[in-house]
Amino acid sequence: MNTQSSVTESVVRNHLQAFLEQKGVAAIVDDYDETARFHSEARTYHGKQEIGGFFVDFIGSLPAGAIERFALRTLRVDGSIAYITWSVGSEIPLGTDTFVIGNGKIVSQTFAMYAAPVQ
C-alpha cells in the first residue's frame, strides 16, 4: 500500500471510529476539510457546518441500537479515494460511501443507503 493509500485508510477509519464510538458530531466532522462537499440523494452539503447538520439528522433518524449493529462490509482504498459498504441489520441492508481525501482530510464524500420499508 502506498503512502497516500495509507493516509486515506487512516482518515476513513478515524471517521468511522468517531461515529461508532458515539464521540459526537464535532468529532465526526473534525475529519472534514473546511470546504468539504458531502453529496447525498437529497442535496449537496457545503462545509463542516452543513455536513454536521446532516449527521445530526442522520444519527437522529437511525433505528434504536443501529450504531451497535453497524457492520463494515467493504473498505477499498486506491490512492486518495476510499469506498465502503456497510449495513445495519435488516433495517438498512446496504449503505455505501465514497471518500476523497486531500491533505489528511475528507474533501468530498458521497453517501447512499437503502432502508427497508417499515412493515
Regions found by a protein language model. Name each.
Residues 1-30:
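Short, low-complexity N-terminal intrinsically disordered segments enriched in polar/charged residues
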Residues 25-77:
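A solvent-exposed, acidic/Ser-Thr-rich amphipathic alpha-helical stretch
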Residues 28, 77-81, 99-107:
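Short, solvent-exposed coil/turn segments at beta-strand boundaries
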Residues 38, 84, 108-109:
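Short hydrophobic/aromatic-rich beta-strand segments that constitute the beta-sheet cores
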Residues 63, 89-93, 117:
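Short, cysteine-centered beta-strand-loop-beta hairpins and adjacent loop/turn segments enriched
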Residues 82-90:
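Short beta-strand segments that buttress and anchor functional surface loops
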Residues 94-119:
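Short beta-strand edge/turn micro-motifs at domain boundaries
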